[in-house]
């Protein structure tokens, strides 16, 4: 009897002991659960070449691990929807396909998050086909989008146009270059339609100094990057007659890539206590106090990271923490050395970009800050999930899991009024 009790206890403890050290479990009411899984599922659907999109069914596991970069890990279940991958709809616009014919699957994904944007690092989905009839060659859609080689010469003018369109229609300070083509499809019409998914990366060429992308513009390992989906129509005269593009842009990630040696024009790290930063920091805090409507001045407390980049001048990129001082804007016209930080004053995490051309006495500072203690609050019941207890059996061991079931859509088999149920604050994992 004691042996049985010990075995039962171990079966409950093993899942939690196996959990990655330092990982924090997430609950269904945490808005990052939906944001992260939505990003992962949209990426999976975007990479499908044919068939229907998949719709989120439930999230069964979710953890967050803080470090130099915050990493999120999820396991979620999906079901085939009734919207094709070429429909232009998102998975949230689709309903579940009839249960008998629908494919199902489970995905395991890891995401990074920086400046409130998620990016998928890894993702594996195992799909179980439905019981519906299999498509034959005769069933293939004539005139529908078909996959084409990603290195096709037909794509070169289309991709060149896509990158030029991005550079000409965004407010980013630098030009971007093509990094990689991820998928490409074509459709025969009166001419040709192309749908291409591709990634772009920031170069060292600023728009102020370079009117267009050149061959000597170098992609920056520290630079911003993005993923785009472009739709292009090439008419019968082989002219681009229509184009649309949507891009998700992510801030640069310098955690895993080192700068190449002898990279002219690339940013270089400089010590946070370097005298070289003194002038740039002065412009940064002056800009912060000018644009911030707080009644007290802020001063720089800690410099966390800094880089400089030689262009037509110098660009300093600095991350620092600013703290509220005891000097009010009513009593002083500017921040002075005798202003002291308040012990319980507000703290800001700031990112500054300071462009300096000393021979012209030109300084262009840009500062973005966020309160360190800023918390996003939501009304109760806003979560798109409801808590569901799910029984799982693996290798002879049965356990109950708290899963977050998506309540945005109902399959036809479960059609009817949605229950008036508020998501409970419970963790996703056991």
Swiss-Prot record:
CDD domains (UniProt xref) = CY (cd00042)
Which UniProt keywords are listed? Answer: Acute phase, Disulfide bond, Glycoprotein, Protease inhibitor, Pyrrolidone carboxylic acid, Repeat, Secreted, Signal, Thiol protease inhibitor, Vasoactive, Vasodilator
**Region (Disordered) spans which residues?**
411-430
- For whether the record's keyword set contains Endoplasmic reticulum, the answer is no
Where Pyrrolidone carboxylic acid occurs, the residues are: 19
Q: Which compartments is it annotated to reside in?
A: Secreted, Extracellular space
Q: Does Zinc appear among the keywords?
A: no
Q: How is it modified after translation?
A: As T-kinin is preceded by a Met instead of an Arg or Lys, it is not released from its precursor by either tissue or plasma kallikrein.
Q: Name one Pfam family in it.
A: Cystatin
Gene Ontology CC annotations of this record: extracellular region
Q: In which tissues is it expressed?
A: Plasma.
Matching InterPro entries:
Cystatin_dom (IPR000010), Cystatin_sf (IPR046350), Kininogen-type_cystatin_dom (IPR027358), Kininogen_Fetuin_HRG (IPR050735), Prot_inh_cystat_CS (IPR018073)
Query: Where is this chain glycosylated?
Result: 82, 168, 204, 326
Q: Which residues form the Cystatin kininogen-type domain?
A: 28-131, 150-253, 272-375
Q: What else is known?
A: Rats express four types of kininogens: the classical HMW and LMW kininogens produced by alternative splicing of the same gene, and two additional LMW-like kininogens: T-I and T-II.
Q: What does this protein do?
A: Kininogens are plasma glycoproteins with a number of functions: (1) as precursor of the active peptide bradykinin they effect smooth muscle contraction, induction of hypotension and increase of vascular permeability. (2) They play a role in blood coagulation by helping to position optimally prekallikrein and factor XI next to factor XII. (3) They are inhibitor of thiol proteases.
Name of the molecule in the record: T-kininogen 1
């Amino acid at each position: 009897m004691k042996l049985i009790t010990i075995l039962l206890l171990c079966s409950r403890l093993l899942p939690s002991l196996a959990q990655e050290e330092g990982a924090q479990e997430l609950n269904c009411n945490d808005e990052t659960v939906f944001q992260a899984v939505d990003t992962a599922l949209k990426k999976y659907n975007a990479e499908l070449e044919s068939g229907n999109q998949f719709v989120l069914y439930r999230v069964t596991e979710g953890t967050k691990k803080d470090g130099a970069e915050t990493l999120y890990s999820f396991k979620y279940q999906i079901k085939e929807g009734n919207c094709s991958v070429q429909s232009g709809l998102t998975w949230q616009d689709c309903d579940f396909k009839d249960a008998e014919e629908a494919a199902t699957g489970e995905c395991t994904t890891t995401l990074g998050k920086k400046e409130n944007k998620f990016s998928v690092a890894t993702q594996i989905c195992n799909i179980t086909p439905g019981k519906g009839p299999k498509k034959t060659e005769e069933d293939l859609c004539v005139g529908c989008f078909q996959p084409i080689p990603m290195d096709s010469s037909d794509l070169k003018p289309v991709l060149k146009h896509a990158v030029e369109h991005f550079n000409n229609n965004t407010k980013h300070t630098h030009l971007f270059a093509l990094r990689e083509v991820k998928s490409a499809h074509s459709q025969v019409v009166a001419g040709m339609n192309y749908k291409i998914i591709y990634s772009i990366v920031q170069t060292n060429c600023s728009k102020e100094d370079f009117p267009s992308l050149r061959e000597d513009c170098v992609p920056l390992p520290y630079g911003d990057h993005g993923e785009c989906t472009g739709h292009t129509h090439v008419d019968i005269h082989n002219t681009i007659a229509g184009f649309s593009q949507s891009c998700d842009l992510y801030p640069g990630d310098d955690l895993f890539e080192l700068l190449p040696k002898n990279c002219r024009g690339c940013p270089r790290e400089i010590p946070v206590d370097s005298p070289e930063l003194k002038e740039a920091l002065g412009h940064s805090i002056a800009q912060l106090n000018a644009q911030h409507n707080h009644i007290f001045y802020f001063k720089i407390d800690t410099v966390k990271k800094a880089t400089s980049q030689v262009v037509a001048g110098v660009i300093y990129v600095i991350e620092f923490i600013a703290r509220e001082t005891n000097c009010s804007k009513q009593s002083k016209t500017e921040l002075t050395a005798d202003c002291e930080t308040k012990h319980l004053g507000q703290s800001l995490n700031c990112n500054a970009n300071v462009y300096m051309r000393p021979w012209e006495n030109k300084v262009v500072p840009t500062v973005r800050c966020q309160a360190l203690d800023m918390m996003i609050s939501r009304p109760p019941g806003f979560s798109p999930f409801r808590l569901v207890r799910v029984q799982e059996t693996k290798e002879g061991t049965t356990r109950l899991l708290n899963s977050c079931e998506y309540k945005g859509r109902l399959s036809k088999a479960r059609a009817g009024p949605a229950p008036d149920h508020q998501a409970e604050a419970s963790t996703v994992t056991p």
